[in-house]
Regions:
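C-terminal, charged and often intrinsically disordered regions of DNA end-processing helicases
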Residues: 34, 48, 304, 609-633
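Conserved motor-region signature of P-loop NTPase helicases/translocases
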Residues: 1-56, 189, 198-386, 507-515, ...
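Conserved helicase C-terminal RecA-like lobe
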Residues: 381-598, 607-610
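Accessory N-terminal region flanking or inserted into the helicase ATPase core
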Residues: 1-18, 22-23, 40, 95, ...
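Conserved P-loop NTPase-based nucleic-acid remodeling module centered on helicase motor cores
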Residues: 10-13, 38-126, 148-152, 236, ...
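Conserved two-lobed SF2 helicase motor
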Residues: 74-76, 161, 169, 509-518
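A short helix->loop->beta-strand "cap" motif at the edges of active sites that frequently abuts
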Residues: 69, 208-212, 564-566
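A polyampholytic, Gly/Pro-enriched intrinsically disordered region
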Residues: 90-108, 234-237, 282-286, 368-401, ...
Length: 633
Protein backbone atom coordinates (compact mmCIF):
# COMPACT_ATOMS: atom_id res chain seq x y z
CA UNK A 1 0.00 0.00 0.00
CA UNK A 2 1.33 3.46 -0.92
CA UNK A 3 2.54 5.58 1.96
CA UNK A 4 3.52 2.59 4.15
CA UNK A 5 6.89 1.61 2.66
CA UNK A 6 9.65 2.99 0.47
CA UNK A 7 9.27 1.94 -3.16
CA UNK A 8 12.04 0.61 -5.36
CA UNK A 9 13.14 3.56 -7.51
CA UNK A 10 14.53 3.17 -11.04
CA UNK A 11 15.28 5.87 -13.60
CA UNK A 12 15.50 5.49 -17.38
CA UNK A 13 17.53 8.35 -18.83
CA UNK A 14 17.81 9.06 -22.51
CA UNK A 15 17.69 11.77 -25.13
CA UNK A 16 14.98 12.20 -27.69
CA UNK A 17 14.22 9.06 -29.73
CA UNK A 18 15.87 6.76 -27.20
CA UNK A 19 12.69 4.82 -26.49
CA UNK A 20 11.91 6.00 -22.95
CA UNK A 21 8.15 6.10 -23.40
CA UNK A 22 8.24 2.76 -25.19
CA UNK A 23 9.94 1.18 -22.18
CA UNK A 24 7.24 2.54 -19.88
CA UNK A 25 4.53 1.25 -22.20
CA UNK A 26 6.12 -2.19 -22.21
CA UNK A 27 6.38 -2.21 -18.43
CA UNK A 28 2.74 -1.20 -18.07
CA UNK A 29 1.70 -3.85 -20.60
CA UNK A 30 3.72 -6.52 -18.79
CA UNK A 31 2.10 -5.64 -15.48
CA UNK A 32 -1.45 -5.65 -16.83
CA UNK A 33 -1.01 -8.79 -18.93
CA UNK A 34 0.64 -10.43 -15.93
CA UNK A 35 -2.46 -10.05 -13.81
CA UNK A 36 -1.84 -6.70 -12.12
CA UNK A 37 -5.11 -4.99 -11.28
CA UNK A 38 -5.59 -1.57 -12.85
CA UNK A 39 -6.04 -0.13 -9.35
CA UNK A 40 -2.46 -1.17 -8.52
CA UNK A 41 -0.94 0.76 -11.43
CA UNK A 42 -0.76 4.52 -12.00
CA UNK A 43 0.98 6.45 -14.78
CA UNK A 44 1.97 10.10 -14.38
CA UNK A 45 2.88 12.28 -17.38
CA UNK A 46 4.09 15.86 -17.71
CA UNK A 47 0.82 17.08 -19.24
CA UNK A 48 -2.78 15.98 -19.61
CA UNK A 49 -2.38 15.60 -23.39
CA UNK A 50 0.62 13.31 -22.92
CA UNK A 51 -1.38 11.31 -20.38
CA UNK A 52 -4.26 10.85 -22.82
CA UNK A 53 -1.89 9.67 -25.56
CA UNK A 54 -0.10 7.25 -23.24
CA UNK A 55 -3.42 5.67 -22.30
CA UNK A 56 -4.46 5.32 -25.95
CA UNK A 57 -1.18 3.72 -26.94
CA UNK A 58 -1.24 1.36 -23.99
CA UNK A 59 -4.76 0.27 -24.90
CA UNK A 60 -3.51 -1.08 -28.23
CA UNK A 61 -0.66 -2.99 -26.59
CA UNK A 62 -2.42 -4.91 -23.85
CA UNK A 63 -3.83 -8.27 -24.87
CA UNK A 64 -7.31 -7.50 -23.53
CA UNK A 65 -7.67 -4.43 -25.75
CA UNK A 66 -8.36 -0.73 -25.11
CA UNK A 67 -11.43 -1.41 -22.97
CA UNK A 68 -9.28 -3.05 -20.32
CA UNK A 69 -7.43 0.19 -19.53
CA UNK A 70 -10.46 2.45 -19.24
CA UNK A 71 -10.22 2.44 -15.44
CA UNK A 72 -6.43 2.87 -15.40
CA UNK A 73 -5.31 6.14 -13.82
CA UNK A 74 -3.09 7.99 -16.29
CA UNK A 75 -2.85 11.58 -15.07
CA UNK A 76 -0.71 14.69 -15.36
CA UNK A 77 1.52 15.70 -12.48
CA UNK A 78 -0.58 18.79 -11.87
CA UNK A 79 -3.80 16.78 -11.83
CA UNK A 80 -2.25 14.50 -9.22
CA UNK A 81 -1.46 17.53 -7.05
CA UNK A 82 -5.05 18.68 -7.47
CA UNK A 83 -6.32 15.28 -6.36
CA UNK A 84 -4.16 15.34 -3.24
CA UNK A 85 -5.26 18.84 -2.28
CA UNK A 86 -8.92 18.10 -2.99
CA UNK A 87 -8.87 15.21 -0.51
CA UNK A 88 -10.89 15.85 2.64
CA UNK A 89 -7.83 15.50 4.86
CA UNK A 90 -5.95 18.10 2.82
CA UNK A 91 -8.91 20.44 3.17
CA UNK A 92 -8.58 20.30 6.96
CA UNK A 93 -4.97 21.46 6.58
CA UNK A 94 -5.36 24.34 4.15
CA UNK A 95 -8.98 25.35 4.32
CA UNK A 96 -9.65 25.79 0.60
CA UNK A 97 -9.48 23.76 -2.55
CA UNK A 98 -6.64 23.69 -5.05
CA UNK A 99 -7.00 26.79 -7.18
CA UNK A 100 -3.83 27.97 -8.88
CA UNK A 101 -3.20 31.67 -9.28
CA UNK A 102 -3.75 32.62 -12.91
CA UNK A 103 -0.82 34.15 -14.72
CA UNK A 104 -2.80 37.31 -15.36
CA UNK A 105 -3.73 37.48 -11.69
CA UNK A 106 -0.09 37.18 -10.72
CA UNK A 107 0.79 40.00 -13.10
CA UNK A 108 -1.74 42.33 -11.56
CA UNK A 109 -0.78 41.18 -8.05
CA UNK A 110 2.83 42.14 -8.67
CA UNK A 111 1.78 45.42 -10.26
CA UNK A 112 -0.22 46.27 -7.14
CA UNK A 113 2.73 45.45 -4.88
CA UNK A 114 4.98 47.64 -6.99
CA UNK A 115 2.48 50.50 -6.87
CA UNK A 116 2.33 50.12 -3.09
CA UNK A 117 6.01 50.94 -2.93
CA UNK A 118 7.73 47.56 -3.07
CA UNK A 119 11.00 47.68 -4.98
CA UNK A 120 11.49 45.47 -8.00
CA UNK A 121 14.70 43.97 -6.62
CA UNK A 122 13.13 43.23 -3.22
CA UNK A 123 10.15 41.53 -4.82
CA UNK A 124 12.35 39.48 -7.17
CA UNK A 125 14.55 38.33 -4.29
CA UNK A 126 11.54 37.39 -2.17
CA UNK A 127 9.93 35.42 -4.99
CA UNK A 128 13.21 33.67 -5.77
CA UNK A 129 13.55 32.42 -2.20
CA UNK A 130 9.94 31.27 -2.10
CA UNK A 131 10.23 29.51 -5.45
CA UNK A 132 13.40 27.72 -4.38
CA UNK A 133 11.72 26.49 -1.19
CA UNK A 134 8.50 25.47 -2.92
CA UNK A 135 10.39 23.61 -5.62
CA UNK A 136 12.01 21.39 -3.00
CA UNK A 137 8.69 20.76 -1.29
CA UNK A 138 9.14 23.09 1.66
CA UNK A 139 6.58 25.58 2.99
CA UNK A 140 8.73 28.10 4.85
CA UNK A 141 7.56 31.04 6.88
CA UNK A 142 8.12 34.08 4.64
CA UNK A 143 11.19 36.02 5.69
CA UNK A 144 11.09 39.76 5.26
CA UNK A 145 8.35 42.21 4.41
CA UNK A 146 8.30 41.61 0.60
CA UNK A 147 7.85 37.84 0.99
CA UNK A 148 5.13 38.26 3.63
CA UNK A 149 3.22 40.72 1.48
CA UNK A 150 3.45 38.42 -1.53
CA UNK A 151 2.16 35.43 0.44
CA UNK A 152 -0.62 37.56 1.96
CA UNK A 153 -1.64 38.68 -1.53
CA UNK A 154 -1.84 35.04 -2.65
CA UNK A 155 -4.06 34.28 0.32
CA UNK A 156 -6.30 37.20 -0.57
CA UNK A 157 -6.84 35.66 -4.00
CA UNK A 158 -7.64 32.30 -2.38
CA UNK A 159 -5.14 30.64 -4.70
CA UNK A 160 -1.72 29.02 -4.74
CA UNK A 161 1.27 30.06 -6.79
CA UNK A 162 1.71 27.35 -9.41
CA UNK A 163 5.12 26.52 -7.96
CA UNK A 164 3.52 26.26 -4.55
CA UNK A 165 1.00 23.68 -5.73
CA UNK A 166 3.36 20.70 -5.64
CA UNK A 167 4.80 21.73 -2.28
CA UNK A 168 1.33 22.04 -0.74
CA UNK A 169 0.26 18.66 -2.11
CA UNK A 170 3.48 16.97 -0.96
CA UNK A 171 3.18 18.37 2.55
CA UNK A 172 -0.47 17.36 2.75
CA UNK A 173 0.46 13.77 1.92
CA UNK A 174 3.44 13.85 4.27
CA UNK A 175 1.22 15.09 7.12
CA UNK A 176 -1.70 12.78 6.27
CA UNK A 177 -0.32 9.42 5.01
CA UNK A 178 -3.88 8.18 4.62
CA UNK A 179 -4.17 10.43 1.53
CA UNK A 180 -1.46 8.40 -0.21
CA UNK A 181 -3.13 5.18 0.90
CA UNK A 182 -6.38 6.25 -0.77
CA UNK A 183 -4.90 7.76 -3.93
CA UNK A 184 -1.66 5.81 -4.42
CA UNK A 185 -0.80 2.61 -6.27
CA UNK A 186 1.67 -0.24 -5.91
CA UNK A 187 3.33 0.52 -9.25
CA UNK A 188 3.83 4.10 -10.45
CA UNK A 189 5.36 4.97 -13.85
CA UNK A 190 6.42 8.53 -14.68
CA UNK A 191 7.06 9.78 -18.23
CA UNK A 192 9.04 12.97 -19.02
CA UNK A 193 9.99 13.24 -15.36
CA UNK A 194 12.54 15.97 -16.13
CA UNK A 195 9.65 18.28 -17.03
CA UNK A 196 8.00 17.78 -13.64
CA UNK A 197 8.97 19.86 -10.62
CA UNK A 198 10.99 18.31 -7.80
CA UNK A 199 8.20 18.79 -5.25
CA UNK A 200 5.78 16.97 -7.54
CA UNK A 201 8.30 14.15 -8.03
CA UNK A 202 8.50 13.75 -4.26
CA UNK A 203 4.69 13.71 -4.16
CA UNK A 204 4.60 11.00 -6.82
CA UNK A 205 7.13 8.98 -4.83
CA UNK A 206 4.85 9.19 -1.79
CA UNK A 207 2.05 7.66 -3.88
CA UNK A 208 4.18 4.66 -4.96
CA UNK A 209 3.93 1.50 -2.86
CA UNK A 210 6.36 -1.01 -4.40
CA UNK A 211 7.80 0.39 -7.62
CA UNK A 212 8.58 3.86 -8.95
CA UNK A 213 9.89 3.90 -12.52
CA UNK A 214 10.78 7.31 -13.96
CA UNK A 215 11.82 8.15 -17.52
CA UNK A 216 13.27 11.41 -18.76
CA UNK A 217 16.31 13.32 -19.95
CA UNK A 218 18.40 14.54 -17.03
CA UNK A 219 20.04 17.08 -19.31
CA UNK A 220 16.86 18.86 -20.43
CA UNK A 221 15.33 21.14 -17.81
CA UNK A 222 11.90 22.65 -17.52
CA UNK A 223 12.81 26.33 -17.08
CA UNK A 224 9.53 26.94 -15.32
CA UNK A 225 10.61 24.76 -12.37
CA UNK A 226 14.38 24.67 -12.68
CA UNK A 227 15.25 28.31 -13.38
CA UNK A 228 16.32 28.96 -9.78
CA UNK A 229 18.10 25.67 -9.20
CA UNK A 230 21.17 23.84 -10.42
CA UNK A 231 20.39 20.79 -12.50
CA UNK A 232 17.09 19.36 -13.60
CA UNK A 233 14.49 18.17 -11.14
CA UNK A 234 15.05 14.58 -12.29
CA UNK A 235 18.82 14.81 -11.79
CA UNK A 236 18.38 16.24 -8.31
CA UNK A 237 15.82 13.58 -7.45
CA UNK A 238 18.22 10.84 -8.59
CA UNK A 239 21.04 12.35 -6.56
CA UNK A 240 18.90 12.63 -3.42
CA UNK A 241 17.82 8.98 -3.73
CA UNK A 242 21.32 7.77 -4.68
CA UNK A 243 19.90 6.14 -7.80
CA UNK A 244 22.11 5.69 -10.86
CA UNK A 245 19.97 6.23 -13.98
CA UNK A 246 19.99 3.60 -16.70
CA UNK A 247 21.19 5.32 -19.86
CA UNK A 248 19.34 4.49 -23.08
CA UNK A 249 21.14 4.89 -26.38
CA UNK A 250 19.61 7.26 -28.90
CA UNK A 251 18.31 5.65 -32.05
CA UNK A 252 20.22 6.74 -35.16
CA UNK A 253 18.51 9.32 -37.36
CA UNK A 254 18.72 7.70 -40.76
CA UNK A 255 16.12 9.40 -42.93
CA UNK A 256 15.95 10.01 -46.67
CA UNK A 257 17.23 13.51 -47.30
CA UNK A 258 13.93 14.92 -48.49
CA UNK A 259 11.73 13.47 -45.76
CA UNK A 260 10.07 15.37 -42.93
CA UNK A 261 9.32 13.04 -40.03
CA UNK A 262 7.83 13.56 -36.57
CA UNK A 263 9.11 10.80 -34.34
CA UNK A 264 6.08 9.45 -32.50
CA UNK A 265 2.31 9.81 -32.15
CA UNK A 266 2.24 11.61 -28.82
CA UNK A 267 0.32 14.78 -27.94
CA UNK A 268 3.53 16.57 -27.02
CA UNK A 269 6.18 15.45 -29.47
CA UNK A 270 9.54 17.12 -29.73
CA UNK A 271 10.81 18.05 -33.15
CA UNK A 272 14.39 19.22 -33.59
CA UNK A 273 14.45 22.32 -35.78
CA UNK A 274 17.64 24.38 -35.99
CA UNK A 275 18.72 22.62 -32.76
CA UNK A 276 15.77 24.21 -30.93
CA UNK A 277 13.26 21.90 -29.29
CA UNK A 278 9.72 22.66 -30.35
CA UNK A 279 6.64 20.90 -29.04
CA UNK A 280 3.73 20.27 -31.36
CA UNK A 281 0.28 19.16 -30.31
CA UNK A 282 -0.17 15.86 -32.08
CA UNK A 283 -2.52 12.96 -31.89
CA UNK A 284 -2.32 9.21 -32.11
CA UNK A 285 -2.01 9.33 -35.88
CA UNK A 286 -0.87 6.98 -38.60
CA UNK A 287 -1.22 7.05 -42.38
CA UNK A 288 -2.96 4.40 -44.44
CA UNK A 289 -1.88 4.83 -48.05
CA UNK A 290 -4.63 2.51 -49.24
CA UNK A 291 -7.21 5.17 -48.34
CA UNK A 292 -6.15 7.34 -51.26
CA UNK A 293 -6.62 5.92 -54.76
CA UNK A 294 -4.02 8.07 -56.53
CA UNK A 295 -1.38 7.40 -53.90
CA UNK A 296 -2.15 3.69 -53.97
CA UNK A 297 -1.70 3.63 -57.74
CA UNK A 298 1.56 5.55 -57.47
CA UNK A 299 2.83 3.22 -54.77
CA UNK A 300 1.83 0.14 -56.75
CA UNK A 301 3.58 1.47 -59.83
CA UNK A 302 6.71 1.85 -57.75
CA UNK A 303 6.46 -1.74 -56.57
CA UNK A 304 5.13 -0.81 -53.14
CA UNK A 305 1.70 -2.04 -52.16
CA UNK A 306 -0.73 0.38 -50.60
CA UNK A 307 0.00 -1.03 -47.17
CA UNK A 308 -0.48 0.60 -43.83
CA UNK A 309 2.61 2.50 -42.77
CA UNK A 310 2.45 2.36 -39.00
CA UNK A 311 1.01 -0.15 -36.56
CA UNK A 312 2.60 0.84 -33.24
CA UNK A 313 -0.59 1.58 -31.32
CA UNK A 314 -1.89 3.83 -34.08
CA UNK A 315 -5.37 3.98 -35.52
CA UNK A 316 -5.22 4.43 -39.31
CA UNK A 317 -7.25 7.37 -40.51
CA UNK A 318 -8.39 8.30 -44.00
CA UNK A 319 -5.64 9.98 -45.94
CA UNK A 320 -7.98 12.74 -47.12
CA UNK A 321 -8.64 13.73 -43.53
CA UNK A 322 -4.96 14.04 -42.71
CA UNK A 323 -3.12 15.94 -45.38
CA UNK A 324 -3.04 18.87 -47.68
CA UNK A 325 -2.94 17.19 -51.11
CA UNK A 326 0.53 15.75 -51.85
CA UNK A 327 2.13 17.63 -48.94
CA UNK A 328 2.29 15.81 -45.65
CA UNK A 329 3.99 15.85 -42.31
CA UNK A 330 3.73 12.18 -41.42
CA UNK A 331 3.40 11.05 -37.82
CA UNK A 332 4.86 7.54 -37.46
CA UNK A 333 6.43 5.67 -34.58
CA UNK A 334 10.17 5.53 -34.17
CA UNK A 335 12.05 2.30 -34.61
CA UNK A 336 12.94 -0.11 -37.35
CA UNK A 337 9.89 0.76 -39.47
CA UNK A 338 10.88 4.39 -39.79
CA UNK A 339 13.15 4.28 -42.82
CA UNK A 340 10.95 1.75 -44.58
CA UNK A 341 7.90 3.95 -44.05
CA UNK A 342 9.72 6.99 -45.40
CA UNK A 343 10.77 5.10 -48.50
CA UNK A 344 7.19 4.02 -49.13
CA UNK A 345 5.97 7.58 -48.83
CA UNK A 346 8.69 8.78 -51.19
CA UNK A 347 7.78 6.06 -53.67
CA UNK A 348 4.17 7.22 -53.47
CA UNK A 349 5.23 10.66 -54.68
CA UNK A 350 4.52 12.56 -51.49
CA UNK A 351 6.44 15.83 -51.27
CA UNK A 352 8.20 16.09 -47.91
CA UNK A 353 10.65 18.38 -46.14
CA UNK A 354 13.88 17.67 -44.30
CA UNK A 355 13.88 18.28 -40.55
CA UNK A 356 16.65 16.76 -38.44
CA UNK A 357 18.57 17.89 -35.39
CA UNK A 358 21.46 19.37 -37.33
CA UNK A 359 19.58 20.73 -40.30
CA UNK A 360 16.92 23.41 -40.52
CA UNK A 361 13.72 22.99 -42.46
CA UNK A 362 14.42 23.75 -46.08
CA UNK A 363 12.30 24.72 -49.03
CA UNK A 364 9.02 26.56 -49.17
CA UNK A 365 7.50 26.82 -45.67
CA UNK A 366 4.14 26.04 -47.21
CA UNK A 367 5.35 22.49 -47.75
CA UNK A 368 5.38 21.92 -44.01
CA UNK A 369 1.80 20.97 -44.44
CA UNK A 370 -0.31 19.31 -41.80
CA UNK A 371 -0.33 17.57 -38.47
CA UNK A 372 -3.76 16.19 -37.59
CA UNK A 373 -5.16 14.95 -34.31
CA UNK A 374 -7.75 12.31 -33.58
CA UNK A 375 -9.46 14.62 -31.14
CA UNK A 376 -10.85 18.10 -31.52
CA UNK A 377 -8.86 20.10 -34.03
CA UNK A 378 -6.26 20.20 -36.75
CA UNK A 379 -2.93 21.94 -37.01
CA UNK A 380 -2.11 23.09 -40.51
CA UNK A 381 0.88 24.92 -41.85
CA UNK A 382 -0.62 26.58 -44.89
CA UNK A 383 -0.28 29.90 -46.64
CA UNK A 384 -2.60 31.74 -48.99
CA UNK A 385 0.25 33.19 -51.03
CA UNK A 386 3.91 34.21 -50.84
CA UNK A 387 3.00 37.64 -49.46
CA UNK A 388 1.22 36.13 -46.51
CA UNK A 389 3.33 33.16 -45.47
CA UNK A 390 2.25 33.28 -41.86
CA UNK A 391 -1.44 33.52 -42.66
CA UNK A 392 -2.92 30.37 -41.24
CA UNK A 393 -0.52 28.29 -39.46
CA UNK A 394 -4.02 27.49 -38.40
CA UNK A 395 -5.14 26.38 -34.98
CA UNK A 396 -8.81 27.01 -35.45
CA UNK A 397 -10.96 24.29 -34.00
CA UNK A 398 -12.36 23.29 -37.38
CA UNK A 399 -12.05 19.70 -36.18
CA UNK A 400 -11.81 16.64 -38.34
CA UNK A 401 -15.15 15.54 -36.95
CA UNK A 402 -16.83 18.18 -39.11
CA UNK A 403 -14.46 19.49 -41.74
CA UNK A 404 -11.46 17.65 -43.11
CA UNK A 405 -8.04 19.20 -43.42
CA UNK A 406 -8.36 18.75 -47.16
CA UNK A 407 -11.46 20.94 -47.25
CA UNK A 408 -9.68 23.66 -45.31
CA UNK A 409 -6.67 23.32 -47.59
CA UNK A 410 -9.01 23.74 -50.53
CA UNK A 411 -10.15 27.03 -49.05
CA UNK A 412 -6.53 28.19 -48.89
CA UNK A 413 -6.01 27.24 -52.53
CA UNK A 414 -9.27 28.96 -53.48
CA UNK A 415 -8.10 32.13 -51.73
CA UNK A 416 -4.68 31.97 -53.36
CA UNK A 417 -6.15 31.64 -56.84
CA UNK A 418 -8.21 34.79 -56.30
CA UNK A 419 -5.48 36.66 -54.42
CA UNK A 420 -7.76 36.92 -51.39
CA UNK A 421 -7.17 36.68 -47.68
CA UNK A 422 -8.43 33.37 -46.29
CA UNK A 423 -11.06 35.07 -44.16
CA UNK A 424 -12.27 37.11 -47.13
CA UNK A 425 -12.56 33.91 -49.15
CA UNK A 426 -14.51 32.24 -46.38
CA UNK A 427 -16.87 35.21 -46.10
CA UNK A 428 -17.47 35.13 -49.86
CA UNK A 429 -18.70 31.55 -49.91
CA UNK A 430 -22.34 30.95 -50.74
CA UNK A 431 -23.74 27.53 -49.98
CA UNK A 432 -26.19 27.85 -52.88
CA UNK A 433 -23.47 28.57 -55.42
CA UNK A 434 -21.51 25.88 -57.27
CA UNK A 435 -18.85 24.56 -54.93
CA UNK A 436 -15.42 25.98 -55.81
CA UNK A 437 -13.78 23.19 -53.82
CA UNK A 438 -14.62 20.22 -51.65
CA UNK A 439 -16.22 21.23 -48.39
CA UNK A 440 -17.24 24.74 -49.45
CA UNK A 441 -20.90 24.20 -48.64
CA UNK A 442 -20.12 23.00 -45.14
CA UNK A 443 -17.69 25.86 -44.56
CA UNK A 444 -20.31 28.35 -45.70
CA UNK A 445 -22.85 26.79 -43.36
CA UNK A 446 -20.44 27.09 -40.45
CA UNK A 447 -19.78 30.71 -41.34
CA UNK A 448 -23.51 31.48 -41.31
CA UNK A 449 -23.84 29.78 -37.93
CA UNK A 450 -21.04 31.93 -36.58
CA UNK A 451 -22.72 35.11 -37.78
CA UNK A 452 -26.02 34.03 -36.27
CA UNK A 453 -24.46 33.23 -32.92
CA UNK A 454 -22.75 36.60 -32.74
CA UNK A 455 -25.95 38.40 -33.69
CA UNK A 456 -27.91 36.45 -31.08
CA UNK A 457 -25.38 37.34 -28.39
CA UNK A 458 -25.55 41.00 -29.33
CA UNK A 459 -29.37 41.05 -29.17
CA UNK A 460 -29.39 39.21 -25.87
CA UNK A 461 -27.18 41.75 -24.15
CA UNK A 462 -28.72 44.78 -25.81
CA UNK A 463 -25.40 46.11 -26.98
CA UNK A 464 -22.67 45.41 -29.47
CA UNK A 465 -21.14 42.41 -27.78
CA UNK A 466 -19.42 39.18 -28.61
CA UNK A 467 -20.26 36.93 -25.68
CA UNK A 468 -18.05 33.90 -25.87
CA UNK A 469 -18.57 31.29 -23.19
CA UNK A 470 -16.49 28.36 -22.04
CA UNK A 471 -15.32 25.96 -24.75
CA UNK A 472 -16.61 23.21 -22.48
CA UNK A 473 -20.08 24.74 -22.46
CA UNK A 474 -20.37 25.83 -26.07
CA UNK A 475 -18.25 23.68 -28.36
CA UNK A 476 -20.32 24.75 -31.33
CA UNK A 477 -19.21 28.33 -31.01
CA UNK A 478 -15.60 27.81 -30.06
CA UNK A 479 -15.04 25.19 -32.72
CA UNK A 480 -16.81 26.94 -35.56
CA UNK A 481 -16.53 30.67 -35.04
CA UNK A 482 -12.85 31.26 -34.45
CA UNK A 483 -11.77 31.33 -38.09
CA UNK A 484 -14.55 33.71 -39.05
CA UNK A 485 -15.09 35.88 -36.02
CA UNK A 486 -13.01 38.74 -37.42
CA UNK A 487 -15.16 38.99 -40.53
CA UNK A 488 -18.41 38.49 -38.60
CA UNK A 489 -17.52 41.09 -36.04
CA UNK A 490 -17.08 43.66 -38.76
CA UNK A 491 -20.87 43.71 -39.09
CA UNK A 492 -21.20 44.84 -35.49
CA UNK A 493 -18.15 47.01 -34.98
CA UNK A 494 -17.78 50.05 -37.17
CA UNK A 495 -14.49 51.80 -37.87
CA UNK A 496 -15.57 54.49 -35.43
CA UNK A 497 -16.03 51.93 -32.72
CA UNK A 498 -12.66 50.39 -33.45
CA UNK A 499 -11.15 53.84 -33.13
CA UNK A 500 -12.89 54.12 -29.77
CA UNK A 501 -11.21 50.88 -28.75
CA UNK A 502 -7.84 52.43 -29.50
CA UNK A 503 -8.65 55.56 -27.54
CA UNK A 504 -10.46 53.99 -24.60
CA UNK A 505 -8.72 50.72 -23.89
CA UNK A 506 -5.62 50.76 -26.05
CA UNK A 507 -6.57 47.67 -28.04
CA UNK A 508 -8.01 47.08 -31.46
CA UNK A 509 -9.37 44.42 -33.75
CA UNK A 510 -6.24 42.36 -34.16
CA UNK A 511 -5.27 41.20 -37.61
CA UNK A 512 -3.33 38.18 -36.43
CA UNK A 513 -1.05 36.25 -38.74
CA UNK A 514 -0.46 33.40 -36.30
CA UNK A 515 -3.03 31.31 -34.52
CA UNK A 516 -6.62 32.40 -34.13
CA UNK A 517 -7.80 35.69 -35.61
CA UNK A 518 -9.50 38.51 -33.89
CA UNK A 519 -9.87 39.19 -30.22
CA UNK A 520 -11.60 42.16 -28.72
CA UNK A 521 -10.83 44.48 -25.86
CA UNK A 522 -13.48 46.58 -24.14
CA UNK A 523 -14.86 49.79 -25.51
CA UNK A 524 -15.24 52.72 -23.16
CA UNK A 525 -18.84 51.76 -22.40
CA UNK A 526 -19.19 48.37 -24.06
CA UNK A 527 -17.08 45.47 -22.84
CA UNK A 528 -16.35 42.45 -25.00
CA UNK A 529 -15.28 39.03 -23.85
CA UNK A 530 -11.95 37.98 -25.30
CA UNK A 531 -12.20 35.07 -27.69
CA UNK A 532 -12.19 31.70 -26.03
CA UNK A 533 -10.68 32.62 -22.68
CA UNK A 534 -13.02 31.63 -19.87
CA UNK A 535 -10.81 31.94 -16.82
CA UNK A 536 -13.07 34.51 -15.19
CA UNK A 537 -10.84 37.49 -15.91
CA UNK A 538 -12.25 38.75 -19.20
CA UNK A 539 -14.05 42.11 -19.00
CA UNK A 540 -17.69 41.11 -18.57
CA UNK A 541 -19.11 44.24 -16.95
CA UNK A 542 -19.67 47.61 -18.56
CA UNK A 543 -18.22 50.74 -17.05
CA UNK A 544 -21.70 51.88 -16.06
CA UNK A 545 -22.62 48.60 -14.36
CA UNK A 546 -19.49 48.14 -12.26
CA UNK A 547 -16.81 50.79 -12.82
CA UNK A 548 -14.29 49.33 -10.36
CA UNK A 549 -14.65 45.79 -11.65
CA UNK A 550 -14.46 46.91 -15.25
CA UNK A 551 -11.28 48.88 -14.64
CA UNK A 552 -9.67 46.04 -12.69
CA UNK A 553 -10.46 43.52 -15.40
CA UNK A 554 -9.06 45.84 -18.04
CA UNK A 555 -5.88 46.11 -15.99
CA UNK A 556 -5.63 42.32 -15.99
CA UNK A 557 -5.75 42.25 -19.77
CA UNK A 558 -3.20 45.04 -20.04
CA UNK A 559 -0.84 43.17 -17.76
CA UNK A 560 -1.04 39.94 -19.73
CA UNK A 561 -0.76 41.59 -23.12
CA UNK A 562 2.17 43.68 -21.93
CA UNK A 563 3.97 40.56 -20.80
CA UNK A 564 3.26 38.82 -24.09
CA UNK A 565 4.47 41.82 -26.06
CA UNK A 566 7.67 42.07 -24.07
CA UNK A 567 8.61 38.48 -24.84
CA UNK A 568 7.70 38.67 -28.49
CA UNK A 569 9.37 42.11 -28.84
CA UNK A 570 7.24 42.47 -31.95
CA UNK A 571 9.95 40.79 -34.01
CA UNK A 572 7.59 37.95 -34.82
CA UNK A 573 5.08 39.93 -36.84
CA UNK A 574 6.23 37.78 -39.74
CA UNK A 575 4.29 37.62 -42.89
CA UNK A 576 2.24 40.68 -42.13
CA UNK A 577 0.79 42.20 -45.26
CA UNK A 578 2.40 45.54 -46.24
CA UNK A 579 -0.71 47.54 -45.38
CA UNK A 580 -0.93 45.83 -42.01
CA UNK A 581 2.72 46.49 -41.26
CA UNK A 582 2.28 50.13 -42.22
CA UNK A 583 -0.79 50.42 -40.00
CA UNK A 584 1.23 49.28 -37.03
CA UNK A 585 3.48 52.26 -37.65
CA UNK A 586 5.97 53.21 -34.99
CA UNK A 587 4.76 50.49 -32.64
CA UNK A 588 6.58 47.83 -34.61
CA UNK A 589 10.35 47.98 -34.53
CA UNK A 590 10.93 45.33 -37.12
CA UNK A 591 8.84 43.27 -39.50
CA UNK A 592 10.61 40.44 -41.23
CA UNK A 593 9.68 37.67 -43.61
CA UNK A 594 8.72 34.40 -41.97
CA UNK A 595 10.82 31.29 -42.36
CA UNK A 596 9.94 27.72 -41.58
CA UNK A 597 11.97 27.86 -38.40
CA UNK A 598 10.00 30.94 -37.35
CA UNK A 599 6.83 28.96 -37.84
CA UNK A 600 8.23 26.31 -35.55
CA UNK A 601 9.30 28.87 -32.97
CA UNK A 602 5.71 29.98 -32.62
CA UNK A 603 4.37 26.55 -31.69
CA UNK A 604 1.57 27.21 -29.18
CA UNK A 605 3.04 25.21 -26.31
CA UNK A 606 6.38 27.04 -26.63
CA UNK A 607 4.61 30.36 -26.44
CA UNK A 608 2.58 29.15 -23.48
CA UNK A 609 5.71 28.11 -21.62
CA UNK A 610 7.45 31.39 -22.27
CA UNK A 611 4.43 33.24 -20.94
CA UNK A 612 4.48 31.18 -17.76
CA UNK A 613 1.33 29.22 -18.60
CA UNK A 614 2.75 25.72 -18.54
CA UNK A 615 -0.61 23.93 -18.47
CA UNK A 616 -3.67 26.14 -18.85
CA UNK A 617 -6.86 24.74 -17.46
CA UNK A 618 -8.77 25.42 -20.66
CA UNK A 619 -8.09 25.27 -24.35
CA UNK A 620 -9.40 28.82 -24.47
CA UNK A 621 -6.35 30.03 -22.60
CA UNK A 622 -4.14 28.33 -25.16
CA UNK A 623 -6.14 29.84 -27.97
CA UNK A 624 -5.72 33.29 -26.50
CA UNK A 625 -1.98 32.99 -25.97
CA UNK A 626 -1.58 31.68 -29.49
CA UNK A 627 -3.11 34.87 -30.85
CA UNK A 628 -1.22 37.49 -28.86
CA UNK A 629 1.00 38.17 -31.84
CA UNK A 630 -0.86 41.35 -32.60
CA UNK A 631 -0.93 45.10 -32.26
CA UNK A 632 0.61 46.22 -29.01
CA UNK A 633 -1.17 48.16 -26.31
Amino acid sequence: MAGQQSPTVAILEGAQSSGKTGRLLERARALLDGGCDVADLMVVCASKDAAAAFKRRLGFRVSAGPESVERLRVVSARALSYEALADKDAQTLYGHGPRVLLDVERSILIADLRQAGMGKEDLAAACKELYRAWDTGELPEPQGEPARRYVDALAAFGAYDVRELGARAFNAVRSRPEIAQRLGASHVLVDDANLIGLAQLRLIEAFAGQELLLAGDCGVANPFFDAAATGTSLARFAQARAVEPTRLAQAPLDFPEDTFVVKSPEPLTEVQTCAKTVKYILGNVAVDLSQDLELTEAASAAGEGGTQVAKDGCEPIPFDDLVYPNEVCVVIPQGSMLKDACQKLKAAGIATVTCTESQSVGGDPRRVASVATLQSFTLLGLAADERDLMCWRTWVGLGRADISAKAWAGLVAYAAERNMHVLDALASLDASAPEPFEGAELLAKRYAQACALIAKASRKHGRQLIDIVSPNENLTFTRLCEPVVAQSAGKFFSRANLAAVDRGFGGRLWDVRVGIPAAFAGLETKACVLLGLNEGVAPRATHEEAPARFENECRLWRALLHKARNWLTMSYVQGAAPDHAQALGARVKRVKRATASDVAMLAPSVLLRELGMAEPSTMGAQQFVACVLCDTL
